[in-house]
Amino acid sequence: MPGSDFRNLMAQSESSGNYGILTDAGGGDMVAGAYQFGDARLEDFMKDTGEEFTREDFLASPELQDRVMNWHEQDVVDYAMENGLDRFFGQEIKGVPVDMSAVVGMAHLGGRKGMRDFLESGGELDKKDKFGTFISDYGRKFSGQSLYNETPPRPRMRPQGLLPPETSPRPMARPAGLLG
């Protein structure tokens, strides 16, 4: 499986690395592929990139699934940086050493809002999925994993230009004590 330590761990955790799996996430929602993306997240990807595909296309293409995962990681990192959530990096919240990979892991389970609520509440808002997995569980599991194995993230373009350097995504997850 190509990519980062984070991505390999995510695929193993979500699907045992099975790119062709379709799982009932409860409430009539299905999640698909090695990383178990739901329809809403796949629609976010298609809207952002202009690509279009069916769930069947997605399940049949490991390359497409890896592209979506690349986009997903970058999208969560951009969201965290644009919303000042990097101020939590280096802290431990409810047993989660907060770094970029923990943030992406928490957002993968609970969405960007669930991750943000967890951080801003000091861990008090720690939602769980239908299997009983808490956002904090994913934070602990994925903290310290390298996100970008092949290329560092690109700065996201905005109408006013590039984000200033102090808000640009950091290229690698870093040990909690090293973030300033």
Kindly label every feature range from the protein language model.
Residues 1-28, 34, 40-180:
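Non-catalytic cell-wall polysaccharide-engagement segments
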